[in-house]
C-alpha cells in the first residue's frame, strides 16, 4: 500500500463501501421481492414520470441493455407501463408498482441511512454529503488524460 496516494485509497474505500452496501441492500430488499437496482429504477420512475427509457438510463446505475431487461421484467410483474406517445415511448408506475415502492421505501431508506446514522453524527453526515457532492460534480466533468 506504500505506493498508493490518499486519493487512490479513498477511491478503493468508496468502491468497497458501495459493493458492501449494495450486497446488504440486495439481501434486505429480498423481503420486498426487489433488488437494489429495481428499487432505484422504481424510485426514479416515480420521481420523474412519465420519462423515456433514455432519460431513465441517465438517472440510474444500470447499463442500457440491463435497463431494457429490467423494464421488461417490471412490466411483466405489473409494476410499470410503457406507453407509446407518437414517436416517444414513456414509462410510468402502475398502482401495483406504486404500492410495491411504498411498502419498501420507508424501510429501505431507514436501512440506507443506518450505514451513516450508526457511526456519524448529523454534522459529520452533512460534511460527508458536501464532500461527496463536490467529488461527484467534478467526476461528471472529468476527462480522460491524454495518451
UniProtKB/Swiss-Prot annotation:
Top-level lineage group: Bacteria
Pfam families, per database record: MarR
Residue ranges annotated for the HTH marR-type domain, each copy included: 1-137
InterPro entries on file: ArsR-like_HTH, HTH_MarR-typ, WH-like_DNA-bd_sf, WH_DNA-bd_sf
Regions crossing the membrane: none
GO molecular function: DNA binding; DNA-binding transcription factor activity
Entry's Gene Ontology BP terms: regulation of DNA-templated transcription; response to stress
Keywords for the protein's UniProt record, in alphabetical order: DNA-binding, Transcription, Transcription regulation
DNA-binding region residue numbers: 53-76
SMART domains in the record: HTH_MARR
Gene3D superfamilies (alphabetical): Winged helix-like DNA-binding domain superfamily/Winged helix DNA-binding domain
Name the UniProt record assigns to this protein: Uncharacterized HTH-type transcriptional regulator BC_1936
Amino acid at each position: 500500500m506504500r505506493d498508493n496516494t490518499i486519493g487512490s485509497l479513498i477511491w478503493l474505500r468508496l468502491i468497497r463501501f458501495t459493493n458492501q452496501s449494495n450486497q446488504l441492500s440486495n439481501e434486505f430488499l429480498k423481503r420486498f421481492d426487489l433488488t437494489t437496482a429495481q428499487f432505484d429504477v422504481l424510485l426514479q420512475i416515480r420521481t420523474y414520470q412519465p420519462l423515456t427509457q433514455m432519460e431513465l438510463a441517465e438517472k440510474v446505475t444500470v447499463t442500457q441493455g440491463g435497463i431494457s431487461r429490467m423494464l421488461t421484467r417490471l412490466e411483466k410483474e405489473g409494476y410499470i407501463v410503457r406507453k407509446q406517445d407518437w414517436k416517444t415511448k414513456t414509462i410510468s408506475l402502475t398502482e401495483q408498482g406504486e404500492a410495491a415502492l411504498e411498502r419498501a421505501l420507508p424501510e429501505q431508506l431507514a436501512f440506507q441511512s443506518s450505514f451513516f446514522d450508526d457511526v456519524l453524527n448529523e454534522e459529520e453526515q452533512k460534511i460527508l454529503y458536501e464532500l461527496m457532492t463536490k467529488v461527484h460534480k467534478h467526476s461528471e466533468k472529468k476527462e480522460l488524460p491524454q495518451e
